[in-house]
Amino acid sequence: MDVHDLFRRLGAGAKFDTRRFSADAARFQIGKRKYDFDSSEVLQGLDFFGNKKSVPGVCGASQTHQKPQNGEKKEESLTERKREQSKKKRKTMTSEIASQEEGATIQWMSSVEAKIEDKKVQRESKLTSGKLENLRKEKINFLRNKHKIHVQGTDLPDPIATFQQLDQEYKINSRLLQNILDAGFQMPTPIQMQAIPVMLHGRELLASAPTGSGKTLAFSIPILMQLKQPANKGFRALIISPTRELASQIHRELIKISEGTGFRIHMIHKAAVAAKKFGPKSSKKFDILVTTPNRLIYLLKQDPPGIDLASVEWLVVDESDKLFEDGKTGFRDQLASIFLACTSHKVRRAMFSATFAYDVEQWCKLNLDNVISVSIGARNSAVETVEQELLFVGSETGKLLAVRELVKKGFNPPVLVFVQSIERAKELFHELIYEGINVDVIHAERTQQQRDNTVHSFRAGKIWVLICTALLARGIDFKGVNLVINYDFPTSSVEYIHRIGRTGRAGNKGKAITFFTEDDKPLLRSVANVIQQAGCPVPEYIKGFQKLLSKQKKKMIKKPLERESISTTPKCFLEKAKDKQKKVTGQNSKKKVALEDKS
């Protein structure tokens, strides 16, 4: 129903007095309707029933008077039809309004939901990033705990689990990585897992790991990676070791893994030759130097210095606890001079050893910049792959009997025998040479050529038993040593750890037998603790011995026990042999003088 129909219904039966209100009627044009078109056309155009049939006839006044009922019916049907149309319009309008409102509400709801979803995504991303970080930390902690890696410091670099990570994270030279894998190093050892990333981040390092755990490779790989390529700047890396044998071993390992990279790695053999080769007038076509402290100090003290260390970026001290020792057997003064000679602002230092020395640790904390401390397993502990045994022999003569008993029972060579002095090494050699076994001795009084030949023969298996002093126990890797005999009791637990560390290397099994007498009682407790920590049996009565004070320990290290002679030859024969030796040397010296005079 439209507006006109509504007013028509309301005004049904009401009449407007046109006579009385003629002016208003004329103004609003109230009167009879005038149609511009014929009513028949309208009626013919109407189709109430949807059958497209026109209504015949014309609806006039006469017809309405004649058939009022039909007209009323048509009018009612027309009004009903209009009502239905108006209802449909209302429904469509309300449906459109409802749909618009619904669309608006849906749009509003969707925007709200989108905002809620964004917040949820942000929360989830925060949660996932936090979870990922926690998972990463858990993996790192699991790896460190699994391999007994103990780290102290700030901003600790993550350890590596494989050598391939060096390519993924640090872009290692492909040739260097291939050399490492070709050398048989498929997986990094615990010390390599943590020490390599620390040095690659340029952090100064104090590292301690059991003997035979791959410390040489732990500092060699990051040095070669950080130097990147050869450069004519002089030595950029310096590696110090206490013995020439150990320096030679490090030099050999560096050459092996750097093959094809072009690095020039040198070792000082003769100081005079080195002064010409590495002096101020040299071309500086060298990169890495491996040496002992004394030879380097000799070059530094020359005027002008026979070597320039101003370009050194990495200073590595292997067996640092030995080099930091004071006194005749230590190298503390020499090491201080070397540190001062490395004047570059880029220089970083790394200390490696099988044992943690308190002096070294304190010095590193005071002098190294933001140092990181890395240790594998329990500090100052023996290798777990070594079967350790304490054997009471009563007296000095009992030691020689025990060695001969081992020879009779049979042993699996190669064997290392440690004594406390050069004189005792000579005496034991003369006693065992008649036992029918291939035995040799190595000590500081032998020439360098003799020492090199002895080490080479021992590695080749030509020598079954090698007698040596404690200094040789530092770092040298004799592959396949099955037995270590501590003929003379070590002066400290640290020395004991280094001695027995010559066997059981790289995960292989080994055995260590330590002789002790009544005189060794004060030193027993500290060594017994090391043996017990490694899971080996120790007699109960030894555990009850009193501990030595630190002052007493230092005295015993500086002044070892005076022991009886090993030699079983009567003194009279020994004195005659000495006199004969003096006469021979005197005659030889006279002949030399005579030859010089003639010339």
Swiss-Prot record:
It catalyses: ATP + H2O = ADP + phosphate + H(+). Signal peptide: none annotated. It is found in: Nucleus, Nucleolus. Residues 385-546 form the Helicase C-terminal domain. Disulfide bonds: none annotated. Keywords: Acetylation, ATP-binding, Helicase, Hydrolase, Nucleotide-binding, Nucleus, Phosphoprotein, RNA-binding. This is Probable ATP-dependent RNA helicase DDX52. It comes from Homo sapiens (Human). The lineage of its organism: Eukaryota, Metazoa, Chordata, Craniata, Vertebrata.
